[in-house]
Amino acid sequence: MPFGCVTLGDKKNYNQPSEVTDRYDLGQVIKTEEFCEIFRAKDKTTGKLHTCKKFQKRDGRKVRKAAKNEIGILKMVKHPNILQLVDVFVTRKEYFIFLELATGREVFDWILDQGYYSERDTSNVVRQVLEAVAYLHSLKIVHRNLKLENLVYYNRLKNSKIVISDFHLAKLENGLIKEPCGTPEYLAPEVVGRQRYGRPVDCWAIGVIMYILLSGNPPFYEEVEEDDYENHDKNLFRKILAGDYEFDSPYWDDISQAAKDLVTRLMEVEQDQRITAEEAISHEWISGNAASDKNIKDGVCAQIEKNFARAKWKKAVRVTTLMKRLRAPEQSGTAATQSASDAATPGAAGGAIAAAAAAAAAGGAASASGASATAATEGGAGCAAKSDDIASADRSATPATDGSATPATDGSVTPATDGSITPATDGSVTPATDRSATPATDGRATPATEESTVPATQSSALPAAKAAATPEPAVAQPDSTALEGATGQAPPSSKGEEATGCAQESQRVETS
């Protein structure tokens, strides 16, 4: 086996923590990201320095899924513009991912430090990103979170290459994808509109990156009153869906027509008409001599410092508003069924009673009894698990199941298991849990992550009638977890509300 890890699905042959420390010296934490801590590690045998990402399994299913996803994707890829996987260890409590160490700077910092910056410099950056993305797309891998923060220089040499990092959201395109994820300002229209999507979303993001590098401005942005986040979000998604951006004067006055043409083709609203990464590499602005050599540093840097140093547009998008925007196409169809569901769930056993009654009405008395028993026996366990997750440092570890948003440490957003939004910590939108199941040897379904604190149930034990009688609560009022994350305090609730929360949680447990 080329790396130190065991097969991800193996439940027995874990690495011992000593295997990690015997081979690597781990320094102090140099950065904390959404799902992991990042260390600078030294190989005791070769003396080489690497980046180590440590994921704690106890932080929830989202974290375990992110680690497994990044490991799986990085094992598949080998490209000069992608940070390469060096080693992996999986212990009972952690995932350790060792990567090449990039010692260069982020692209923004590099631009600000240059005495001379032109379209040709931008063309060189975009070309390398396109080549890496074209390679990923040839493997049917969608990165889904391309942004300037994930582009770094490999070293500090003058002609250093660009490398792409952060693959925890990358996904194999086995059919079109529906779950929304990414960073809001880089989201393609099909993601905002909750359509099925695929590789073209990466090309849209490259168009946004190119727009910023040439003008210093994000394409979808306008000045709003301080803290007027709701209008910011509303305008952001409206403009993305319409492709409403312009090449404003004076910022684009010195930019070539060829550059504008490539941006336009990358940011085509209709995904089936959008230029591919492979096609973009052949564009005259990338492969020809159409990129201007005129110095545009002063104008670009002034706008970068205005828009990005203050980081206004990069601030975490407000949870509730973004959830409503991303779920807008579903909202009208689920509002009526949600009202009926709320009326049928007045107390602690409301969910179980409603399910049992519906099953009985459908002629499945035995199924109704099973539904009631399942909800009753698992309600307490679901509430206990929810309580544990709320007490955890990662408030986003347990997604809400009522369509509400569950904020994390900075109010940014990630979708939960039902397509609702729970917060991340870097402004990106990420799927919360892995709903897939690992088939056991006897044909039963077992949960994909055995370390989860929330008990799972076999899908065969769930009555079909109950599932049909319990509509997805897609647009319910935000629950106590969401309010707690937004205010820093748990809101007061009546016993009836607590009991309803238990019933809702039990439904989530059953469907997981």
Swiss-Prot record:
Q: Where in the sequence does UniProt note compositional bias of the Polar residues kind?
A: 398-439, 449-460
For this UniProt record, the keywords arranged alphabetically read as follows:
Calmodulin-binding, Cell membrane, Cytoplasmic vesicle, Membrane, Phosphoprotein
Q: Where is the composition biased (Low complexity)?
A: 332-347, 461-478
Question: What cofactors does the UniProt entry give for this protein?
Answer: Ca(2+)
UniProt cross-references to InterPro entries, sorted A to Z = Kinase-like_dom_sf, Prot_kinase_dom
What residues bear Phosphothreonine in this entry?
A: T446, T470
Membrane topology is: Peripheral membrane protein
Q: Which GO terms describe its biological process?
A: modulation of chemical synaptic transmission; regulation of modification of postsynaptic structure
Where does this one sit in the cell? Cell membrane; Cytoplasmic vesicle membrane
Quick check: keyword Aminoacyl-tRNA synthetase in the entry? no
The family database entries (Pfam families) matched by this protein are listed as:
Pkinase (PF00069)
User: Keyword Cell membrane: yes or no?
Assistant: yes
The record's SUPFAM superfamilies line, in alphabetical order, gives:
Protein kinase-like (PK-like) (SSF56112)
GO molecular function annotations of the record: ATP binding; calmodulin binding; protein kinase activity
**Transmembrane residues, as ranges?**
none
Q: Where is this region: Disordered?
A: 328-347, 393-512
Q: Name one GO cellular component term.
A: cytoplasmic vesicle membrane
Q: Which residues form the Protein kinase domain?
A: 24-286
Instruction: Tell me where in this chain the PTM Phosphoserine is found.
Output: S392
**Which superkingdom is the protein from?**
Eukaryota
Family to which this protein belongs: Belongs to the protein kinase superfamily. CAMK Ser/Thr protein kinase family.
Function noted in UniProt:
Does not appear to have detectable kinase activity.
Provide the assembly information. Answer: Interacts with calmodulin, in the presence of calcium.
Written domain comment of the UniProt record: The protein kinase domain is predicted to be catalytically inactive.
The entry's protein name is CaM kinase-like vesicle-associated protein
